[in-house]
From Swiss-Prot:
The gene is pqqE. GO terms for molecular function: 4 iron, 4 sulfur cluster binding; cyclase activity; iron ion binding; oxidoreductase activity; S-adenosyl-L-methionine binding. InterPro entries: 4Fe4S-binding_SPASM_dom, Aldolase_TIM, Elp3/MiaA/NifB-like_rSAM, MoaA_NifB_PqqE_Fe-S-bd_CS, PQQ_synth_PqqE_bac, PqqE-like, Radical_SAM_PqqE_MftC-like, rSAM. It catalyses: [PQQ precursor protein] + S-adenosyl-L-methionine = E-Y cross-linked-[PQQ precursor protein] + 5'-deoxyadenosine + L-methionine + H(+). [4Fe-4S] cluster binds at residues 22, 26, 29. HAMAP family: PqqE. Catalyzes the cross-linking of a glutamate residue and a tyrosine residue in the PqqA protein as part of the biosynthesis of pyrroloquinoline quinone (PQQ). Binds 1 [4Fe-4S] cluster. The cluster is coordinated with 3 cysteines and an exchangeable S-adenosyl-L-methionine. Pathway: Cofactor biosynthesis; pyrroloquinoline quinone biosynthesis. The keyword Iron-sulfur applies. This is PqqA peptide cyclase. Its EC number is 1.21.98.4.
Amino acid sequence: MNPSESNVKPPLWLLAELTYRCPLQCPYCSNPLDFAQQEKELSTAQWIEVFKQARAMGAVQIGFSGGEPLVRKDLPELIRSARELGFYTNLITSGIGLTQKKIDAFAEAGLDHIQISFQASDETLNAALAGSQKAFQQKLEMARAVKAHGYPMVLNFVLHRHNIDQLDRIIELCIELEADDVELATCQFYGWAQLNREGLLPTRDQLVRAEAVVHRYREKMAASGNLANLLFVTPDYYEERPKGCMGGWGAIFLSVTPEGMALPCHSARQLPIRFPSVLEHSLQDIWFNSFGFNRYRGFDWMPEPCRSCDEKEKDFGGCRCQAFMLTGNADNADPVCSKSEHHGTILAAREQANCTNIQVNQLRFRNRANSERVNSQLIFKG
């Protein structure tokens, strides 16, 4: 496919997964299960070349992610380079390893936005989920420091069955920290979250209660002005139609892994597709011409019931990674869809959520030992 003859638009959003290294062990991490086998990382110069190519194609926003991007000592240089190229720059961090000195350096380099994640609203549960006794107080301190520096206060909480019932306390913490934007993102089941799904998926009753809490606080905050934006993301496991994943395959979003693999979404490396490397191909060639990025573009690839569905232009057939994880074939309709012949797997997961008694300490945490343990069990190693 020649780009000039294609109706494919260039990417707008670049996710730079700088590293898989991380001081925390969250059991819902979206990093690949075999991250312990993926130790190579692009150099500073290689990342900057990726930024230049993405910007030349028209990408406008970049997210620095991981792992924990703060472990990269060259982060200020990467931020500066991206900003000088004209990117809107966003740091996605746990806050562990962040210091006032680093905040100053990032601001001087031109960083536009910092998002800090929390595991819970109290120190005990936060420590249990993160695998760190000191994480909660560090997060509080750095959240306040980010706010004091003049950055928008942007917080992220991943919700699941073990913390969703404290949602009122989570929102109260956000108000206390004077948050401007809060993302209450119910667990999306990829990577380590999929491995731990039975112990993480909330029940429908929990979600109903949570939605009521969010609604109540939205009304309260609309009157008081305490919080500019409260985003509540529910799990698609309780929907009857799939999400339009990533705005369509290879349509808006481009992710580059620590070692340079280019992906149309950050979970796609688990698929039985050999995705190209930025060390071997230009981003232009990867985006427009590679097999991996064209594999699920458009609608021609779709089997039934997606091919004849009048909703296909809305959901694009759903998530290819979810179809692969739950059916073994990424071509299948996303099982979330009630039209899918595999929808029973979703119904079974909902029922399982009502019966499980898995506790936090029984979850499989994202650490090197567990990564090496599950690596041999993977269906496909990207």
